[in-house]
Curated annotation (Swiss-Prot):
This is Small ribosomal subunit protein bS20. SUPFAM superfamilies: Ribosomal protein S20 (SSF46992). Residues 1-26 are annotated as: Disordered. One of its GO terms (biological process) is translation. Residues 1-18 have a biased composition (Basic and acidic residues). NCBIfam families: S20 (TIGR00029). Belongs to the bacterial ribosomal protein bS20 family. One of its GO terms (cellular component) is cytosol. Binds directly to 16S ribosomal RNA.
Length: 91
């Protein structure tokens, strides 16, 4: 446990920030997995496109705000785009 008042405050701040970061990353994981499930179940193209767009928007937002590294966001977007393109071609 922290011995100083400022250290206690830093601990509280880091716990809040850690929880916020975890929740945002979890939202992203859910969006990506939802899109992949939709593709696996051969859902309608329009539904998959909406899921794709929301996942890409979330990736952009998290990358710009440094919740995840910008390169990781770019790599994930590329993977999702390839997955989406292969799904569209298959139909």
């Amino acid at each position: 446990m922290p011995l100083h008042k400022s250290a206690e405050k830093r601990l509280r701040q880091s716990e809040r920030r850690n929880a916020r970061n975890r929740s945002r990353k979890k939202e992203l994981k859910v969006l990506v997995k939802t899109m992949q499930k939709l593709i696996d179940t051969s859902a309608e193209k329009a539904v998959v496109e909406v899921a794709y767009r929301s996942a890409v928007q979330k990736l952009d937002r998290l990358g710009v705000k440094n919740y995840i590294h910008a390169n990781k966001a770019s790599r994930k977007k590329s993977q999702l785009t390839r997955l989406m393109n292969s799904y569209v071609k298959a139909d």
